[in-house]
C-alpha cells in the first residue's frame, strides 16, 4: 500500500431544501388553506477515525466531498427528506487543520472518534408556516439555507508505542523486519526507506507497535530530506530506539548529529525516553566494536546496547528495554492528579 501522510481536501455540506407553496384542493372545499411542507435539512460532512487504515492515500485520488442537498417540501404538509451525510474515513493519528495549515480543528487519536466538519443547511419553511390571523393564504415560502464549505488539510502522525530513529542505512528497517511481520524494503544503500512504516512486536507474551521512519540527515528539523515530516511520525511514541551504525566512521559523532536534529525539532521529542543501541555489531571485529562502543558511550552518557539484527544478538534485550519504558510511560499517565488545595 502506498503511503501518504498529508492531503488537502474540499468539503461542502448540503443545502437545505426549499419550502413548498401549496394549497389544499378538495371537492366541496373552496378555501382549503395553505399546506406547503418544509424542505429537508442538508447533509453534514463528518470525519471518522476507523480501523485498518495507516495512510491517507485515498485522498490523493479524490479531493472533493459534498453531502447531499435536502429535498424540497411538498403539498399536503409533506416535509422534504433530509440530505444524506458524507463521512471521510481516516486512520488514527490524523489531525485536521484549516486551509491556512496552522489552525488545528481536530486531532483524532482513537478509533471511533467522529467530528462534524460542516453542518448542513436548514430546510426552508413552506407557506403553511407563514399562516397568521391576518394572512390566511400566504403565497411565499423560504428557500433552503446554504451549506458550509471549506478547504482543510489532513495530516497523519502515526500512533506507535516506540519509534526507530537514526541516520540512513543505520539498520532500522532490518531491525523492524527482524522483530515484526512488516516487510520493509532493505538494501545496502542510504534512503532505502522512503516512507514511515509500522509493525507489531510480540515479545515475552506482550505486544507493542513499532514505527520506522526514513533516515535523518543534517538539517532534518528544517525540512532537509523531508526530515521534519518524518520526525512528526514519532512525536506520539512513548520511547525512541536510537540506532547508531557500528560501521560508521565515528559512532559518537553519528549519535550527536541525530540527537541534535531531534533537539532542534522540538515538540517534546527530545524529552522522550531514549534507548541507544549500536547496530551491525556482527560486521565489526572485537577491537573496532570496543572502540565504537566507547565512543558512543561518551557521546550518549550511558552504555549502549549492542545489536545485530542479522544474528539477533541483543535484540531480545532491546525489546525488553522498550517494553519497560512503554509500561513506565503508561503507568505515569494512569496516575491520578492530586486535587489542588489552597
UniProtKB/Swiss-Prot annotation:
GO terms for cellular component: cytoplasm. InterPro entries: G_OBG, GTP-bd, GTP-bd_Obg/CgtA, GTP1-OBG_CS, GTP1_OBG_dom, GTP1_OBG_dom_sf, OBG_GTPase, P-loop_NTPase. One of its GO terms (molecular function) is GTP binding. Keywords: Cytoplasm, GTP-binding, Hydrolase, Magnesium, Metal-binding, Nucleotide-binding. It is found in: Cytoplasm. Mg(2+) binds at residues 173, 193. GTP binds at residues 166-173, 191-195, 212-215, 279-282, 308-310. Residues 1-159 form the Obg domain. It comes from the Bacteria. Pfam families: GTP1_OBG, MMR_HSR1. Disulfide bonds: none annotated. GO terms for biological process: ribosome biogenesis. Its cofactor is Mg(2+). Monomer. Belongs to the TRAFAC class OBG-HflX-like GTPase superfamily. OBG GTPase family. This is GTPase Obg.
